[in-house]
Amino acid sequence: MEHLLAGLNRAQHEAVTATEGYVRVIAGAGSGKTRALSHRFAYLVNELGILPGNILCVTFTNKSANEMRQRIHALTGDNDTGYINTFHGFCVSVLQEDSHAVQYPKSFLVLDNSDIDAMLGIIYGERGLTLRDMTYSAARDMIEIRKLFKEPEYYKDMITVSLDTLREKYERADTAGDIIFYGYLYQEKKCFGLDYNDLIKFSLYIFEQHEDIRLKWQQRLEYIMIDEFQDIDALQYELMEVLCGYHGNLFIVGDPDQTIYTWRGANVKYLLDFDKVFPNVQTIMMMENYRSTPEILAAANSLIAKNGHRIKKDLLPTKPSGEKVVCHFADTQEAEAQWMVGEMKRLHDRGLPLRDMTVLYRAHYVTRAVEEALMHEKIPYTIYSGVQFFDRMEIKDALSYLRMIAYQDDLSFRRIANAPKRNLGKRRMAFLQETAEKEGTSLYVTLKNHLEDSVFSGTKAKQFVDLIERFSHSYQGRPISEVLSDILDKSGYEKALRTEGSQERLDDLAELKQSIYEYETSCGEESTMEHYLAHIALFSNGDVAEQGDKVKLMTVHAAKGLEFPYVFLCGMNEGIFPSRKVRTLPGMEEERRLAFVALTRAEKGLYLSEADGWNFDGSPRYPSRFLLDIDRELLSFTHEVDETLLREAADDVARRDKYLREDDGDGTLPIGQRVRHAVFGEGTVLDVDLNKGAHVIQFDGMGTPRSISLRAKLEKIGP
């Protein structure tokens, strides 16, 4: 036991050993909560004898889950690390075990955005829609909004209604929104595919309808731990309530000062009111910070103290003193960027690698001047956005080959049947689609059944079928990395990339193989092809890091949960950070929490900067209120402060604050309310955007939702 508890501070020790009942840990930024969680898991296993398979540990990103698995493996020496997942990843486990309860096979597909876009392509082609009717991005958003708000019971159709009935519903649809929505549900059911929204909905349905399955999972999960509890949404909370309903051993960790996802459905009240909902809650405050210098923490504490609705607490430093937080006022954005790059060069000349330096910002458009300055000085950098690793063409193709081997589904077939070229172009694919519809078979089975048809003469269709047949009968029991290398070689895919001279794509494939090898090593016997494909479909931004000595650029939201030796927070101007879109007092407090998150990413050095000039609307640009919030003695200014500028900035903040509303819901309609607009006709309220002061309404005759001012006249239809 000593080695598990050694080195823990009092609060961490208390969190690790408080194993029974309901426990809430308020853990400040950099306070070692990941260490406490991993040691608590190991304590349950090594000291109390709890089986890893009886513990559920929920994190909010796959990267966090992987880090947690590695830490726990190092502590326990056991490859069995139980259920360490995101909520969506855990639901995949539930559905893989109990998919029979919803008439789905264990080999269901977890759909990502590229899969959804492929389905949309089929729907648009069949029904004559174009991107003028609705872009794919808007269609994905519309589908998600309808699933969450307008038709939250949609999943019952996917479970209980026949495929033919769903197709009839799709064929009867006459508006762009209905065509896309019902066409998508039909395509989902046709290939037994589930998107992120479906995973939790289907799991909750199973637990609601099948008491034996619910009880099985409740009894199995003797201990439940949930990280980042301030980010939990209503569906995740409902799932948590179900799972802990038998043993009542629930351990949650969160920080209300880091609630920055309310726009995505997160609700900090679940953390703040935890002791009001559950009995005999033990609350532990974990405030010692092991990340940042006292100077950085003092500035962060000073900033967040200006929020009124919070648990009053301060982060306590444990690291030795460093340099004061630097603050720079520039005349222009170009001058701001040049100053930042000059500071980076100074740090680099001291021997610090560029990868230790990170630029954070509230909005992407702020980076233009920074990028230009970096390029001018020939300083390499990478932006953590754009095409992420698992969305790159060659990676999607490689994973589609694996999915084709395991599932032989239509989405994978469409992607790789002609990659590399096999002379299976649009005409032959159209023939396959039409024939498959008539015969009620998949595209791959249709191709197998019609190989001798004249339409496939002069193609490599038979070689493709032989390849898939050979691998589909031999892949089980083989290492996934070996299967991937083999099929990329036998298919000619890698050879085609070499012929094209696509070294970067070949490097990406090498990285994929290495990541699969690491997955196999960490998962042991659980590393089946099916498990891996479900695991990889859940990956999101930031799960694969860029390599090399480069300056990193990313939004503050993307930096959540990360830490960097030196942070440059730029664009600290009113209207940029905080965003000009903020319309409410709670919205402004969330912006301040976001700034707090940005400051607490820094370990050794923190640089804050703003640029004078003019906003998009022609108004003068002033320093951010967040710079004014920090006590001046905690900052080191690069030049003498212009007191007139600061007074004007304070006056500007006071003017803006007059227009901030209390978030009391006055004048808003409930989500799901049917309404009638004088011009747009009837529609349904999908959301209320208090920051914009608008209802988000999907009108029946329009393809995309509209934001309608709260002041606009709307007639309620029905209750």
Regions found by a protein language model. Name each.
Residues 31, 230-309, 313-318, 437, ...:
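Conserved helicase motor core of SF1/SF2 NTP-dependent helicases
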Residues 54-141, 328:
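Conserved P-loop NTPase-based nucleic-acid remodeling module centered on helicase motor cores
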Residues 117, 121-193, 211, 268, ...:
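Basic/charged alpha-beta structural segments of nucleotide/phosphate-handling enzymes
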Residues 170, 353, 367, 371-379, ...:
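Conserved helicase C-terminal RecA-like lobe
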Residues 571-704, 710-719:
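C-terminal accessory regions
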